[in-house]
Amino acid sequence: MSTFRAKVRREEKFRMKCESGNHTMLLDEPLKAGGTDLAMNPVEALLSALGACKCINAWIFADQFGINLKDIVFEMEGDIGALEKVDNCLPLIFKSIHTKITVF
């Protein structure tokens, strides 16, 4: 089993600085949600991370089985919805996540 760690702290309003090892990235909310729109939002980052995992695994699989790929693109789309109210809060969850894969 491997343990991964990340640290997240507020930079300004809804802009967050995310750190893991020697790497840093920003996450933010769009202007209409009160952010500064200087980076993708956390939901987009989660979809991107899932897509990156799938893409990396596809390249590993192709290499292991001698499949000559020119390129492969994963387009991720997720539908967000609220659960039942818990302690006056509506937690959001993915109701569905879809992946469109284009292979070249």
Regions found by a protein language model. Give the residues of each.
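Extended beta-strand/beta-hairpin segments
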Residues: 1-48, 59-104
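Alpha-helical metal-binding/catalytic segments enriched in His/Glu/Asp
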Residues: 50-54
